Amino acid sequence: AVVNAETRQILLVSTPRDYYVPLSISNGKKDKLTHAGIYGINVCMDTISMLYDVDIDYFFRLNFTGFVDIVDALGGITVVSDYTFTAGNYSFVKGENQLDGTAALAFCRERHAFATGDRQRGKNQLAAIKGIVNKVTEPSILMNYSSFLSALEGSFETSIPYSLISELVKAQLTDNSAWDIVSYSVDGTGD
């Protein structure tokens, strides 16, 4: 994601995990993007930085449990689905869906229900991130962000300094206008 606090814009990009890209440690040899994770967060950041020719200053990493915890701590999120589909015991409609953490995780993980598989899953993950951003920027959440973050301790890892989080929260409370969130999904075929 690229976040511009001055223009209140967020750019989200989904890159399929099975894309073959040069890893930052591979001397130009291509491997699946997902394999960058084997070498740690710095290799992931450097590989994405090389791929898109952008500087990546911070990371935010969580696992499935952390994702569920965050969505539940927010009181659920609203996601907009491109399709009506089912995933396990959950059904989703085309359009707006109100989801708790477990349902949001099912929404984000499903790929077999779609002709485009992992590509649609990536789009659904972007929709969930939008839902989280929209919810976390609500004044009711921001007024208690410190206790919110404390309650979620251990649910995620980030290199974003607490001071920067505080600045962003104060700016959002001062100017409660919505953020412009744009998302793109990379597409393509192999050589």
Locations of regions flagged by a protein language model:
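Non-catalytic, solvent-exposed segments at the cell envelope interface
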Residues: A1-D191
